[in-house]
């Protein structure tokens, strides 16, 4: 299983057979690897939900952490492509000056990757942010490109972080202006861009922005110039590179760009690979822990989750068998609904309909036989003929 996280499934099968004489099928390796990955996704989702719900005290952090995030495309089935988002967190080491340049390195880099949208990525990544103690770290910087979802991610996790626009990304914008001014690939364009990048790195963005504003006035029809000027003006505070270097911060997002290649593309973007969408996150979860050198720490959680899922399946199957043995309830005959009359009933004759209904006691008529029947005392009294 662990081999299949590092290499394609069939290569893992061949390695086990050739090196260890262990015979397993590719289907078995695929099934077990995906099950382990899905279990770890469930573990991390539960942890993230608990952190968001209970807001536990943050773990102790480092003196100086840097965070960087980016996206990488992976191939899905049916010719589709989807963006995997990755967050990388590392400890910043003291800057070292080499050949008149400050060199800043990071260590203990860890990763969190998911195939989700930006709004889902923010709370899900809490699990790694909390584990690294980002909230309690004394200093935190976020080196990103200028995408809005990245700035939202920084605001979500550490709003007071020092925000640094990736230097290569800023240089790309300036290079586009040079290509538009002097022609794509011309020596003049390359020379102009190189001079401005050196100026940006060692002097900051102020003079460059002034020059770009003047160029826009001279070339009002040049859309690429107007677009990139607006982009850079909005992020002027994130391009104070001389100050950032003096503070010992990295000014490039190479940490996460390497993560895109190492964590994501090396395993999910190989020749001929096309993934089911539901299988991407399980593999990413396992890639995160092997590339962060945390397999030994996290594997017990995976085993525990797999056991929990197996018990739940057994209980569910047992309950289904119990319900299947129960006698079926006796069928209750259905009463057919009464059919509505196709025609309304005929009206009663007027004299019948209007005949008042009698209520209360009624006296017998004068000639009723009961009038002449002896009842009560009259029964014992002599008749008139007898008295006469």
Model-derived segments and spans:
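Catalytic center-proximal scaffold of phosphoryl-transfer enzymes
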Residues: 1-388
